[in-house]
Amino acid sequence: MSLEHAILGFLNYAPMTGYDLRKAFDTSVRHFWPADQAQIYRTLKELTRRGWVTVEVVPQEDRPNRKVYHLTDAGREELHRWLRAPSDPEDPRVPLLVKVFFAGQLTNEETIALLEGYAAGLRARLEAYARIPQQAAHYAEAVRSPREVFFWALTLDYGVRLTRAALEWAEETIRHIRNLEEES
């Protein structure tokens, strides 16, 4: 996936400012495709150059003009082309697993501490996932499409399942290391 296509997807729902896009990312796809404000504006500039979006300058009193971005027909065609294209499996790189691979060079306590920190992060992620439905409610009302909301829920389910599996692995690995301590 690319940031470009995520932005095209959001603009397909409605015209938005860069700030609106940042809020949309933060309350929806951030957990599997984060983007900061600078990346969003840089990408909007490129999308405008390609003719996939247009920008409407809305004058405001006592504040800078607002730039509202609109999806063009060419941008919609690109979004649909990308949506139909096959997806490659995810990048298999997991930095934690490289550390675990070489953890024989650490004490068991150090490795357990590493894994406990990882597990704590996963628990925090699950808590954040639990808040997503209420955060996304605003966008669900704006889109007014049960079909769209259904697909949003599928991505959340994927994230929850993946995170639970990683947490289960981390907890089981900690148990194995503790058993290794007892056998030594």
Residue ranges and their predicted role:
Residues 1-93:
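Basic helix-turn-helix/winged-helix DNA-binding cores
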Residues 172-184:
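Long amphipathic alpha-helical coiled-coil segments
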Residues 160-175:
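Amphipathic alpha-helical coiled-coil segments
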Residues 81-131:
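Amphipathic alpha-helical dimerization/coiled-coil segments
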Residues 108, 115, 122, 149-152, ...:
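Amphipathic alpha-helical coiled-coil segments and their boundaries
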Residues 32-33, 101, 152:
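Tryptophan-centric aromatic hotspots in well-structured domains and transmembrane helices
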Residues 132-154:
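Acidic interhelical loop/turn segments
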Residues 17, 21, 43, 49, ...:
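Amphipathic, well-ordered alpha-helical segments in soluble domains
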